[in-house]
Amino acid sequence: MTNQKQETKLWGGRFAEKTAELVELFNASVGFDQRLAEQDIRGSLAHVAMLGGQGILTAEEVSQITDGLNGVLADIRAGNFEWRLDREDVHMNVEAALRDRIGPVAGKLHTARSRNDQVAVDFRLFTKEAALDLAEQTRALRRVMLAEAEKHLQNEVILPGYTHLQVAQPILLAHWFMAYVAMLERDEGRFRDAAERMDESPLGSSALAGTPWPLDRHATAEALGFARPTANSLDGVGSRDFALEFLSACAILSAHLSRLSEELILYSTFEFGFITLPDSHTTGSSIMPQKKNPDVSELARGKAGRVFGNLMALLTVVKGTPLAYNKDLQEDKEGVFDSYDTLSIVLRLYAEMLPKTVWHADVTKAAAARGYSTATDVADYLARQGVPFREAHEVVGGLVGLASRSDRQLWELTDAELKAAHPLLSAEVAQKLTVEESVRSRQSYGGTAPERVREAVEAAKEKLRQETGQP
């Protein structure tokens, strides 16, 4: 990045003074919006082709500008492009480089176009492509989660299910994985829905009111891969809800990945001991040689905060901007870039890490048996015998209190103690209420019984086949 002696601004005709150096520094966005260079040149190529098609530019002018733009693009891709701070942004840098390459005819590129619709189309292109890319990466992780569910379903690995981080009821590990499959399916859908809504081209809206030039906005929209042009020029250049929706989808996905991260961090501790994370995705301590730190999950959990912040930042920017374009909207891009980059790496890391994570089935099963996780099953047993559930709940609550005071499990209570609580209970009944039986009994649709989880796995696999057209 260079900051050369100021040249005449492309917009400088009405100004008598040069821009102050501090204003140059404060005003410039090229340090980050150069990331839109490819989208900017694609938009310009579509625009100049349309100008030629409408007879606004001659064929020779279109050819010169097109060749020049392709040359600038080649320089950018090769890393030979000089980005200049005094040229403010990606648009002015590209146009000035085009002028340096082909001369004054470059000035005709901006016919019937404003930087307002130019940046809007660039940013929509980027955000739409980012949404579709994150949708694909989310689907890839969803597929990994589904494969893990199917793998652990084979041995019906049991895991404690928690509420309030207290052991609640036993579940299948496959059921736990399928919960994340469901979350990721919705996350993917949010990105695809957002991409569909932002599939409109603002190019041709000009500054805000449209243009007297006979443009073909449908042609440029089609050339850029949009479904249609935006229907209102004010909305086209002044709205950033497409970026807000993208950031919202990013934030919700980040929340889900943060919850996953929190569970994996807990489960990998000595105190839980449920999993062993792969060496390839953990780190050590500079002083404690025994440490194996879950840095991937901790960073994924921590980075959720910045993704949330990106959404809140843009909401705060947009809320006070009157129609149409305001310089405030320069602040729309960095958060989108950052959220996209952050989630892209987190999704790929988890797709790598989860298949290499080892689950200790004996430990998870033993943990599921602790904490009176089958207490609800005892209450359900009484209810099936005709005891009102609220009465059954109170009876079993008393038994849990008795067992906890003597540091025993429910099945360790004596026959006399059980019958004293309720005549329908006995040691024989309590011994049958195992975690395996508890899991098998959860036969309701969406429940954790092996048959129900197997159905859910097959349904999820079929849905993926339908979505992708792949076996």
From Swiss-Prot:
The alphabetized UniProt keywords are: Amino-acid biosynthesis, Arginine biosynthesis, Cytoplasm, Lyase
The record's principal subcellular location, in a coarse class, is: cytoplasm
Report the GO molecular function annotations.
argininosuccinate lyase activity
Indicate the enzyme's highest-level EC class.
Answer: lyase
Q: What is its EC number?
A: 4.3.2.1
Query: What Pfam family is a match, any one?
Result: Lyase_1
Q: Does the keyword Ubl conjugation apply?
A: no
Note the CDD domains from the entry: Argininosuccinate_lyase
Reactions this protein catalyses: 2-(N(omega)-L-arginino)succinate = fumarate + L-arginine
| Assigned GO CC terms | cytosol
Query: Where does this protein reside within or beyond the cell?
Result: Cytoplasm
Q: In which pathway does it act?
A: Amino-acid biosynthesis; L-arginine biosynthesis; L-arginine from L-ornithine and carbamoyl phosphate: step 3/3
GO biological process entries = arginine biosynthetic process via ornithine; L-arginine biosynthetic process
Query: InterPro entries, alphabetically?
Result: Arg_succ_lyase_C, Argininosuccinate_lyase, Fumarase/histidase_N, Fumarate_lyase_CS, Fumarate_lyase_fam, Fumarate_lyase_N, L-Aspartase-like
Q: Which family does it belong to?
A: Belongs to the lyase 1 family. Argininosuccinate lyase subfamily.
Q: Which NCBIfam families match?
A: argH (TIGR00838)
Q: What is the protein named?
A: Argininosuccinate lyase
